[in-house]
Amino acid sequence: MGFDQYHEPADELPQETRTFARLCASLTEEAEAIGWYEQRLAVESDGQARAIMRDAQGEEFKHFSMDLEFLLRRTPLWREIAEGILFQEGDIVEHGEESEEEATEGAAERGAPLAGSTSLGIGGLKRAAS
């Protein structure tokens, strides 16, 4: 069974990068499974079948959460951004923008490399055009 998840030759990638890619793929698969269960639950009328599917969906969410936690532990900048967004009240997008700005400014002030930054710099271009 072939699984092409790399955009660069796999044998040239360090093990840490390959593990990171595997967890990204796993996170995606878990998210898809959660969505599939949600669709099944939306159309299933049998209560016992729904209970089984709901339980299975919960397992997928647990796996999704563990994959996400692994990735956030390996990428401190992402973790800092996520902490400003997750479990917060109010506007999600606003929290996201503020959190990203604070995290990247903080990393720059600390002299930390911004490798792995989620920003493409497009927001800066939008502000410059204003």
Kindly give the residue locations of the regions a language model identified.
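Iron-associated oxidoreductase/ferritin-like identity signal
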Residues: M1-S130
